[in-house]
């Protein structure tokens, strides 16, 4: 196995060497790929084969990402009027794919993530015996520089708490409370939107919330912050009512606008590529901070505001 790994190492660009690459080489050594007559050689058809092959390991969120990449590939294939075969995924393909995506105004980060998925499909195809191009392992798109992630400071949160009640509809008040809860609990929207008073227990005089994270399956015990307890007291011990992710994102932008969280902030947001055509892409720029607020800001705000003050284990 040492000779096999070293031989493979000497034949690829060292920038592609990572844990995934090593695991693939080990798999190849112990389970040499054989020709699989059932596996399609066309890339788009192979995506469906890949989904079926890994159906017991793939989460709904991952499946959603795969379908998005598949739709992008379908549009790309239609634009070039030529079927994409796995064996043709090489440097020329990569450049053509990048140029197409840029023309369609996709952000570089989106292009890079889509290409990582394309390589994943092709490497899996290689594993089951489908012919791939010798350039495959060396193909990469450089990740864009990370932009500073926005979060709500304690000053921002105080502004949100102090919004005049007569400015808020019931829906906005509900979203405002969820936003505060998320910023003081640090949980994902898929988890905090499922919070209920039945999940609360008391231990040594402290109120603790127990739940299972939807994404990870981990059992969590979270002490309830005084700001969360204030909201529960206001609502007779109940959490705000559940709303959809989309409505929550829309409402908290409005809440932060009412709180005058307007400082110019670098970031990206979805904008229509051309008025009236209904196609949206993420566009980077400088915007008012409230325009960049999304559901993940609660988790990010908690992590930033409480870093070093609350134990992480």
What are these regions (language model features)?
Residues 194-233:
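Conserved tyrosine-mediated DNA breakage-rejoining catalytic core shared by Y-recombinases
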Residues 108, 112-114, 131-189, 215, ...:
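Basic, Lys/Arg- and aromatic-enriched nucleic-acid-binding interface segment
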Residues 3-14, 34, 41-70, 128-129:
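Short, aromatic/basic-rich helix-turn unit that serves as a nucleic-acid recognition element
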Residues 102, 182-183, 307-308:
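Short amphipathic helical patch at the helix-1/turn junction of helix-turn-helix
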Residues 167-169, 238-239, 253-312:
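Short, basic (Lys/Arg/His-rich) helix/loop patches that form interaction surfaces
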Residues 123-133, 182-205:
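Short, charged phosphate-coordinating catalytic segments
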Residues 48-61, 70-148, 163-168:
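N-terminal core-binding DNA-recognition domain of tyrosine recombinases/integrases
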